[in-house]
């Protein structure tokens, strides 16, 4: 009975310690930190001075031992050795208030591994600035969600607004909804729930929707480039091609990244601190940055670089056209500046401006807060410029309100539906997305 109990206890202890023992197993394959080497040298000095007791009636004991992570003291046979957790390992700080254990068998030998299951990484307290930035991101994403949801409803409800250009806008706005919503869900869930499986799913979804956002920005840039710069219209490129670019390619990239990251089993590095989009995510190794992340980071950088080329090309055509027009120079500059500012959020140029900046002092504080504000309100800005301030949208809404008031004045003699209407009054400028480009010949 006692043997059965001992076997069950041993099996349970081995199962509980299996995951934690990976720390000790990895130690020989990584370069030990100076603190770990210091502990090892101190332990080796103790082992050299630990002379074995040659007395025949001396009780069995386990000698001082170094397991690659911690130093275990001399322990009587059949006893469980208890040691405070190491304070540091491979540059990561651990909670020394918790304990690690190692069994000394009745024959005076150590168990092959130690139990570090209770040794947890110390989580630094969130600074006031980090909390403020997280709040800005949260509020900005919520505002963007509301604005984009209204904009998408307008584009889908009113048939007069259904065209390839607005369909592209709608898909871009949909990526903002998915991206912002996933970030909010991740922030809330990871704040209160520690679940490795859920963390992995949220990480993959966040990276996918983050990528789709940039690829639909690329689609916007490609469409405008074909419309304004190229010799043929962007309407000749079918919507299906844009959908494959915007939704399909990011899926292939993220699946590839997820498989390689899972197989690589890399350790967390900086806990994703450099990525503003995961500011609130905690205890989630999948959010940690490593060299595998270049699989999805390189396409983002490429998209932004290509969109920058698109922007220069479009602005060159616009400025050339304005210079040939009979308008005052001040008015030309005003129109060019307006077009440039409108294109910034659509093509993701804001991300380029916020990619690098000062990190220390007052300048760093201002930059980080500006980064949080601009990036979280990116979706709101797109909805504002390309829906709420769009001439075509305003005319559509104004026309519907006018018709609705007329029917109420008449007394509602016939039922009028907002979606049943004529399309002959609505402007159909191919370059309505940039109103100052309307008169391109």
Curated annotation (Swiss-Prot):
* Residue intervals on the Cytoplasmic side: 159-166, 225-238, 316-338, 392-441
Q: Which residues are glycosylated?
A: 99, 107, 112
Example GO CC term: the record gives:
plasma membrane
According to Swiss-Prot or TrEMBL, what is its membrane topology?
Multi-pass membrane protein
Mostly located where?
A: membrane
Tissue-level expression reads: Expressed in Malpighian tubules.
Protein's UniProt name: Diuretic hormone receptor
Q: What species is given as this protein's source?
A: Acheta domesticus
């Amino acid at each position: 009975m006692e043997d059965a109990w001992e076997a069950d206890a041993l099996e349970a202890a081995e199962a509980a310690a299996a995951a934690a023992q990976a720390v000790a197993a990895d130690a020989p394959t990584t370069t030990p930190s100076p603190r770990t080497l210091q502990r090892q040298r101190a332990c080796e000095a103790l082992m050299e001075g630990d002379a074995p007791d040659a007395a025949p009636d001396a009780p069995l004991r386990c000698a001082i031992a170094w397991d690659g992570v911690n130093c275990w003291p001399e322990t009587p046979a059949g006893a469980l050795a208890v040691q405070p957790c190491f304070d540091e390992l491979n540059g990561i700080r651990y909670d020394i208030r918790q304990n690690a254990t190692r069994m000394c068998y009745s024959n005076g030998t150590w168990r092959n591994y130690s139990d570090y299951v209770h040794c947890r990484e110390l989580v630094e307290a969130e600074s006031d600035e980090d909390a403020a930035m997280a709040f800005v991101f949260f509020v900005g994403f919520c505002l963007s969600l509301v604005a984009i949801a209204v904009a998408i409803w307008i584009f889908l409800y009113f048939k007069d607004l259904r065209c390839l250009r607005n369909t592209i806008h709608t898909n871009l706005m949909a990526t903002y909804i998915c991206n912002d919503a996933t970030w909010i869900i991740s922030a809330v869930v990871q704040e209160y729930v520690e679940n490795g499986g859920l963390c992995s799913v949220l990480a993959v979804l966040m990276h996918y929707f983050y990528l789709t956002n940039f690829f639909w920005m690329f689609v916007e840039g490609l469409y405008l480039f074909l419309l304004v710069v190229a010799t043929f219209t962007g309407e000749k490129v079918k919507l299906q091609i844009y959908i494959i670019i915007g939704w399909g390619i990011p899926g292939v990239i993220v699946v590839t990244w997820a498989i390689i990251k899972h197989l690589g089993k890399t350790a967390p590095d900086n806990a994703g601190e450099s990525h503003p989009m995961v500011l609130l995510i905690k205890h989630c190794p999948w959010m940690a940055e490593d060299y595998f992340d270049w699989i999805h980071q390189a396409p983002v950088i490429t998209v932004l670089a290509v969109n920058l080329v698109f922007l220069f090309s479009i602005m060159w055509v616009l400025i050339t056209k304005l210079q040939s027009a009979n308008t005052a120079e001040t008015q030309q500059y005003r129109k060019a500046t307006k077009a440039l500012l409108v294109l910034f959020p659509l093509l993701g140029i804001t991300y380029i401006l916020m990619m690098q900046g000062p990190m220390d002092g007052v300048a760093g504080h201002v930059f980080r807060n500006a980064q949080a504000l601009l990036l979280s309100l990116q979706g709101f800005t797109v909805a504002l410029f390309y829906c709420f301030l769009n001439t075509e949208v305003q005319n559509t809404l104004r026309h519907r309100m006018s018709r609705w008031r007329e029917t109420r004045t008449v007394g509602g003699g016939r039922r009028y539906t907002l979606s049943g209407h004529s399309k002959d009054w609505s402007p159909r400028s191919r370059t309505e997305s940039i109103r100052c480009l309307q008169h391109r010949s």
